[in-house]
């Protein structure tokens, strides 16, 4: 009896060891699968984050590119408008005979119109330089990253916007007096004698106000380019 019991006990021990080892292997395999699942989930999460960041980056690049193209268009449009205003006003003359006296009206007779012509010439030259800078920036794909340069461009754009508006306002006031006169000071209406002269001045004024509006828009773009350097902690968008 004892001799028959020993092999069975030995068999039971071997069987238990085999079962235990299989259970351990199964547990280790299950644990490994769980870890691999966690790694895959973390990888998917990282991919989602990277895709989201990439989409946000490309969206910013698209906005930046559209702004640059819009700025180029506006700056070259200002060149054309400023030149039109300067030429129309600067070449404006008309000669009339009033009571046997020949009178010649020209833009230099009114200081406000002289200021208008000079200011439009300055704006056209400045817009040409800035427009070429923008074209070069787009061609070389080199964004504006220098804060001092961004501040300089912003300040110059603001100055040009204010001065062009001041020139347009001063010329408009003079044109109004020429058109309506001033009875309190016994200033007569000049445009009833120099109709062509006044119409040409009006065309120059319209162009100058369009220049002022365009320059104000460009100033807003310059403000965006400047303050994004602080908002993104100096990181530029390629």
UniProtKB/Swiss-Prot annotation:
The chain crosses the membrane at residues 67-87, 112-132, 149-169, 201-221. Residues 1-66, 133-148, 222-238 are cytoplasmic. Keywords: Cell membrane, Membrane, Transmembrane, Transmembrane helix. The keyword Acyltransferase does not apply. Residues 88-111, 170-200 are extracellular. It is a multi-pass membrane protein. One of its GO terms (cellular component) is plasma membrane. It comes from the Eukaryota. The keyword Secreted does not apply. It is found in: Cell membrane. InterPro entries: CASP/CASPL, CASP_dom. Belongs to the Casparian strip membrane proteins (CASP) family. Homodimer and heterodimers. NCBIfam families: A_tha_TIGR01569. This is CASP-like protein 2BC2.
């Amino acid at each position: 009896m004892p001799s028959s019991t020993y092999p069975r006990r030995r068999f039971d021990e071997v069987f238990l060891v085999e079962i235990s080892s299989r259970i351990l292997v199964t547990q280790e395999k299950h644990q490994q699968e769980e870890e691999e699942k966690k790694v895959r989930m973390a990888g998917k999460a990282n991919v989602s984050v990277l895709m989201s960041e990439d989409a946000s980056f490309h969206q910013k690049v698209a906005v930046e590119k559209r702004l640059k193209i819009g700025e180029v268009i506006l700056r070259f449009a200002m060149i054309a408008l400023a030149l039109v205003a300067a030429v129309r006003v600067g070449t404006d003359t008309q000669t009339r005979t009033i009571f046997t006296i020949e009178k010649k009206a020209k833009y230099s007779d009114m200081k406000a119109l002289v200021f208008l012509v000079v200011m439009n010439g300055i704006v056209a030259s400045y817009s040409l330089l800035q427009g070429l800078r923008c074209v070069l920036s787009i061609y070389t794909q080199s964004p504006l990253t220098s804060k001092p340069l961004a501040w300089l461009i912003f300040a110059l754009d603001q100055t040009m916007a204010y001065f062009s508006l001041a020139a347009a306002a001063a010329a408009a006031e003079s044109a109004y007096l020429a058109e309506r006169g001033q009875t309190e000071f016994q200033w007569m209406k000049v445009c009833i004698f120099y109709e062509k002269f006044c119409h040409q001045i009006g065309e120059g004024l319209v162009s100058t106000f369009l220049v002022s509006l365009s320059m104000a828009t460009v100033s807003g773009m310059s403000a965006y380019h400047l303050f994004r350097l602080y908002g993104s902690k100096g990181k530029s968008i390629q």
